[in-house]
Amino acid sequence: MDVNNVELIISAVRPEQYPETDLPEYALAGRSNVGKSSFINTMIRRKSMARISQKPGKTQTLNFYKIEEALFFVDVPGYGFAKVSKTEREKWGVMIETYITSREQLRGVIQIVDLRHKPTEDDRMMYEFLKYYDIPVIVIATKADKIPRSKWQKNAKIVRETLDFDPDDKFVLFSSETKMGKDEAWQFIKEGME
């Protein structure tokens, strides 16, 4: 997709704050500091539309990015961040669950994992949660440029096995540095919008 127009419409915490729209939405889920903001910025060809932080746990709201009057990316708080209070994590959990289980415009979730590492228990639980609610998932295995090409398939296999990956879902090797996987990710997103 050729992206020229992107706008952060709202940062929401409750359903009544969600934008009133019929446009399809894709939520972006992933561990804190896994590269969600870098993924968004790569996909929309912007350097800093989604704030990239060295500090995990920066995103604390549902951030609705309208793309080309065609769809929304919804950046959700990263999970698995230990330095946030248990109460705060529980609030985020309720906020994310409410959005994912009740939003009619949601076409799928883009779950971002780090190709360099075996998915965490939090990654596995998120994927299992999405499958329980029968939500289509595009797994983006990011940071592919950080490991030798010869390890890509081995690491991808570990990710798939750890998540108990559903073959009906999509899987993309991705790099924000080289833009590898960008076109493939857009293709899967477009297919889900039809």
Curated annotation (Swiss-Prot):
Domain (EngB-type G): residue spans on this chain: 22-194
Keyword tags: Cell cycle, Cell division, GTP-binding, Magnesium, Metal-binding, Nucleotide-binding, Septation
Residues binding GTP: 30-37, 57-61, 75-78, 142-145, 174-176
A Pfam family that the UniProt record links to this protein: MMR_HSR1
GO cellular component, one term: cytosol
Family: Belongs to the TRAFAC class TrmE-Era-EngA-EngB-Septin-like GTPase superfamily. EngB GTPase family.
Identification of the protein by name: Probable GTP-binding protein EngB
Organism: Listeria monocytogenes serovar 1/2a (strain ATCC BAA-679 / EGD-e)
Encoding gene (name): engB
